[in-house]
Amino acid sequence: MKLCGFEAGLDKPFFLIAGPCVIESEQMALDTAGELKAITAELGIPFIYKSSFDKANRSSGKSFRGLGMEKGLEILATVKREIGVPVLTDIHEIDEIKPVAAVVDVLQTPAFLCRQTDFIRACAQSGKPVNIKKGQFLAPHDMKNVIDKARDAAREAGLPDDVFMACERGVSFGYNNLVSDMRSLAIMRETGAPVVFDATHSVQLPGGQGTSSGGQREFVPVLSRAAVATGVAGLFMETHPDPSKAMSDGPNAVPLSRMKELLAVLKELDTLVKRAGFLEDNFGWPACA
């Protein structure tokens, strides 16, 4: 898959989607994007900057949602222009697709909306690549139906049908908890779409703090190493200069100061795993009858 000027796939080095959960200010967006660009350029990792203009599914109605679409898109356009990186943001309603697609390079669909057929189809007909997040309630093999919906819609509109990614972000495990089943990453390859692992939302504790979500960022390195060892096309990570002051998802955000050391390890592991060239067919091992 061609994505933002680079090739994405299981036989290619992993790419990174990263940035703060929500846009807090233009200056922080510029500073964070600049730092991430420098880190990924040094390590040779393709990079897409991510941040949200609206967090439409906050635990509490009183929580900070963002700066709004108009201001948020203005800031993302500034990041794209001044820092020189592709940008991604999520949309939540069909009406948002057209104005957002006019600014960003990649669209992202929220996990909760992966079964909303009209929404997925509309995103697919935007003409932009789309990172489709798997719902916390969805079996990994069910993502094939979601990707197929997107591809059908793109073809109907006369658009490329190979611009969709399938993103794993954990699965509900009882109340206020998520777990990551690494088999999901291999199963989701059956969609034919590049598979992305969301290493930070996978350690989220949804609603775990009553009026906000908790998180266990100490497990981000553990799960990201496991995902890269399993084999992925891309990684998604939210990061913040000071997670304790983040306005959304601070408990599961990676401190910006720790990103370089983590990515360096993941880069080495990715190179080692993909060197063998056996990931796509699981080393040729047959499935049990």
UniProtKB/Swiss-Prot annotation:
Its main location: cytoplasm. This is 2-dehydro-3-deoxyphosphooctonate aldolase. Its EC number is 2.5.1.55. One of its GO terms (molecular function) is 3-deoxy-8-phosphooctulonate synthase activity. Keywords: Cytoplasm, Lipopolysaccharide biosynthesis, Transferase. Pathway: Carbohydrate biosynthesis; 3-deoxy-D-manno-octulosonate biosynthesis; 3-deoxy-D-manno-octulosonate from D-ribulose 5-phosphate: step 2/3; Bacterial outer membrane biogenesis; lipopolysaccharide biosynthesis. InterPro entries: Aldolase_TIM, DAHP1/KDSA, KDO8P_synthase. PANTHER family: PHOSPHO-2-DEHYDRO-3-DEOXYHEPTONATE ALDOLASE (PTHR21057). It is an enzyme of class 2 (transferase). It comes from Cupriavidus necator (strain ATCC 17699 / DSM 428 / KCTC 22496 / NCIMB 10442 / H16 / Stanier 337) (Ralstonia eutropha). Belongs to the KdsA family. Gene3D superfamilies: Aldolase class I. GO terms for biological process: keto-3-deoxy-D-manno-octulosonic acid biosynthetic process. It is found in: Cytoplasm.
